[in-house]
């Protein structure tokens, strides 16, 4: 159990690290969609170090512009205007890095869920929801109409380059209760690894409460008897005879 706790702690630290790197990359991606030559120092553009008061790289290239010869990564020569939005190499790298971090984060969360599912040996646990990245006071659990709804919402604020940006992150998971579990008996807890466990005091039923016994083979109510050779009331053809039996009138 101690080894399992250490493993869960390491996975939780890795998830927090990936979340932090993902927020940083998202912030870089938001502010790298436009050229900041006249406002801020762009990592791939040296226009702020230009000897002229204004960025003249968008105009015809002159011999006096020595920085553009020294820095081939200056992208102002390839675009008509410096402030024109463009998909540069930094943006493509940021997008690829964000996708890689998302896949890595999803992989870590799946691993954590498998570990938690294997460690839950008691059958009174109805379900578990991973709410990594949310505080316990940001998680809400609602039980209504035979369903359990787990929701969480968080506000993120980024302070980048002197401006503030806000974004919201939320999650909502819903599942149905077994028919033998009462809504009033359902409890939840915020456990290790940022996982919300939904529990019930009684064991959930894996089969119907009153299973139907297999039906007994049906016997015919009135087994068929072999046909009588004739019916005294109605004329008939006796077995093996081509002539009908007629009543004799005396």
UniProtKB/Swiss-Prot annotation:
CDD domains to which the protein is assigned, alphabetical: ACD_HspB10
The stretches annotated as sequence repeats are: 34-38, 73-77
Q: Name one GO cellular component term.
A: centrosome
Q: Which residues carry this modification: Phosphoserine?
A: 5, 10, 64, 86, 122-123, 151, 167, 189, 194
GO annotation terms (biological process): cell differentiation; spermatogenesis
Name the Pfam families on file: HSP20 (PF00011)
Q: In which tissues is it expressed?
A: Testis.
- Which keywords annotate this record? Cell projection, Cilium, Cytoplasm, Cytoskeleton, Developmental protein, Differentiation, Flagellum, Phosphoprotein, Repeat, Spermatogenesis
Sequence segments annotated as region (C-X-P repeat region): 209-238
Q: Does the keyword Signal apply?
A: no
Region annotation 2 X 5 AA repeats of [RC]-C-L-C-D: where it falls in the sequence: 34-77
- Compartment list: Cell projection, Cilium, Flagellum; Cytoplasm, Cytoskeleton; Cytoplasm, Cytoskeleton, Microtubule organizing center, Centrosome
Determine if Cell inner membrane is one of this entry's keywords.
no
Subunit structure of this chain's protein: Interacts (via leucine zipper motif) with TCP11 isoform 2 and isoform 3. Interacts with SPAG4. Interacts with KLC3. Interacts with CCDC42.
Purpose of the protein? Component of the outer dense fibers (ODF) of spermatozoa. ODF are filamentous structures located on the outside of the axoneme in the midpiece and principal piece of the mammalian sperm tail and may help to maintain the passive elastic structures and elastic recoil of the sperm tail.
Q: What is known of its domains?
A: The C-terminal contains many C-X-P repeats.
Q: What is this protein called?
A: Outer dense fiber protein 1
* Organism this protein belongs to: Homo sapiens (Human)
Name of encoding gene? ODF1
């Amino acid at each position: 159990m101690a080894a399992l706790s250490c493993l869960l702690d390491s996975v939780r630290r890795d998830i927090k690290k990936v979340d932090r790197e993902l927020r940083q990359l998202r912030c870089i991606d938001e502010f790298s969609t436009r050229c900041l030559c006249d406002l801020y120092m762009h990592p791939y553009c040296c226009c702020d170090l230009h000897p002229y008061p204004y960025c003249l790289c968008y105009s015809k290239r002159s011999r006096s512009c020595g920085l553009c010869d020294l820095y081939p990564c200056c992208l102002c020569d390839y675009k008509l205007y410096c402030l024109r939005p463009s998909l540069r190499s930094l943006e493509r790298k940021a997008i690829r890095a964000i996708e890689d971090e998302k896949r890595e984060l999803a992989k870590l969360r799946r691993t954590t869920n498998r570990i938690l599912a294997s460690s839950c040996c008691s059958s009174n646990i109805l379900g578990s929801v991973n709410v990594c990245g949310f505080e316990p006071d940001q998680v809400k659990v609602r039980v209504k109409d035979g369903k359990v709804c787990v929701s969480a919402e968080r506000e993120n604020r980024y302070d980048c380059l002197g401006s503030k940006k806000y974004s919201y992150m939320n999650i909502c998971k819903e599942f149905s209760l077994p028919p033998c579990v009462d809504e009033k008996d359902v409890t939840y807890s915020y456990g290790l690894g940022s996982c919300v466990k939904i529990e019930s005091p009684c064991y959930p039923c894996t089969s119907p409460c009153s299973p139907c016994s297999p039906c007994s083979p049906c016997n015919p109510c009135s087994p068929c008897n072999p046909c009588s050779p004739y019916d005294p009331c109605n004329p008939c053809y006796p077995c093996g005879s081509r002539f009908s039996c007629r009543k004799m009138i005396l």
